[in-house]
Amino acid sequence: MNVSLKINLEFPAAIYFQDTLQLNRYTVALELCTATQDHEQINVAMARIKAFVYSELADTVFINQQDAERANILEVMGINVTTLPEDPIDQIIGLMLYCKINAVVEGRMLVEALDISSFIGDEVTYLYNAGDPIGPFQQDGWWFNADTSHNELSGIGIDQNIVHVHAHNWNKYNLNWNDVDYSKTSKTVAFGKRSDHAK
């Protein structure tokens, strides 16, 4: 028997819009329906939603992905960045959450409705129901990935030819599915320097 649930989420973040950084706070209400009878997988799905919102998106800077140079500068400075296909207004952030949350739960649950409001948005609530058009999120992007990614920045460091490859799987939260084998990946790759003993 499938079960309908409602989750309320609240998290701080910022937006970079019109060359200005503005602090904001978001309130999100999710209506979900379970799609499996496996209670352990339902618990993992719920925990993934909370981990993504409270640990990955909290204190992020939402920015239009067209402003790639600014986004990369922010990331090099150590700032948590989330890129979006359009300007970071509440409606776009809500659509992103709808797509990404459906992705991270990988069919164990379904998002049936999502409401979002924010402090900057003057507490106006945007409503989204399953089946509504997803607009700019029809294009391929990280919002369809089941991992914890929330941007597609290069991750290239500014010193010593180092690339920092972020591990976006669920290992760090211990939230993998019990029937899937996830491999661990290295986080740092050196390039551009010839080995001293290479001929």
Feature map (PLM): residue ranges:
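Short, surface-exposed ligand- or partner-binding patches at beta-edge/loop junctions that are enriched
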Residues: 104-118
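Histidine-centered catalytic/metal-coordination loop motif
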Residues: 8-99, 103, 180-199
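Short, Gly/Pro- and small/polar-rich lid/capping loops
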Residues: 1-3
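Short acidic, gly/pro-rich beta-turn/loop elements at beta-sheet edges
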Residues: 38-40, 107, 124-126
